[in-house]
Amino acid sequence: MKLLKNVLLGLFFSMSISGFSEVKVSDTFVKQDTVVEPKIRVLLSNESTTALIEAKGPYRIYGDNVLLDTAIQGQRCVVHALYEGIRWGEFYPGLQCLKIEPVDDTASLFFNGIQYQGSLYVHRKDNHCIMVSNEVTIEDYLKSVLSIKYLEELDKEALSACIILERTALYEKLLARNPQNFWHVKAEEEGYAGFGVTKQFYGVEEAIDWTARLVVDSPQGLIIDAQGLLQSNVDRLAIEGFNARQILEKFYKDVDFVVIESWNEELDGEIR
């Protein structure tokens, strides 16, 4: 069974998939429409007595899946669990989970001084400590972790081929996650450092945008990963005129290139 089919079954996602006829990033990039942007939840802190959370700009507060408030001004306060709820600026009694979400793109969130895209979740644990996770789009997550991984200049076709494999490997990791965990991956294990590290000068953000939501679907699975591609002198292939698709086809036979166009996640709906 092919990788993508495994991902679909294992994650219980409803996806709409279309073929990608020519993977060449030098072509004009056409943004794909999405029903729901694919997201990932990253564990930032598994157990802490307190943490500093700041919302700059308007934000929404959800408690156990219920909208509690919409604030037009930001807030910077310590968050901690109490015996009967969670306190962040004010006390929210009876809650197990507090979600803080920016209202629009002008707003931003900080956890212990580090800026993150997306939303922050604060869970109250049985020992009255808190667990904090960040829900962010998969594309923004990749921009963060790969911006500090690819710190050497590569031809854009070579880099885009690597990005496609990195994205595919991430979906494999999502498939292998423990379904009992609210989060998908741990920040400290993945080198996830939020939004601030994304502003590098090696074309990673552009390559992720050019190949947005594009993965390889191979009967053999990931027989070579992005690191293996780099060790195979992928930059030389790009300089010789191979585009991203042609580069990957040299290593993968009978491979399909698919774009994830929509994602309706059914897991953990009662927690959100």
UniProtKB/Swiss-Prot annotation:
Any Pfam family the entry gives: SpoIID
Taxonomic path: Bacteria, Pseudomonadati, Chlamydiota, Chlamydiia, Chlamydiales
Name of protein: Uncharacterized protein CPn_0389/CP_0366/CPj0389/CpB0400
Lineage: superkingdom: Bacteria
Protein family (similarity comment): Belongs to the chlamydial CPn_0389/CT_041/TC_0311 family.
Organism annotation: Chlamydia pneumoniae (Chlamydophila pneumoniae)
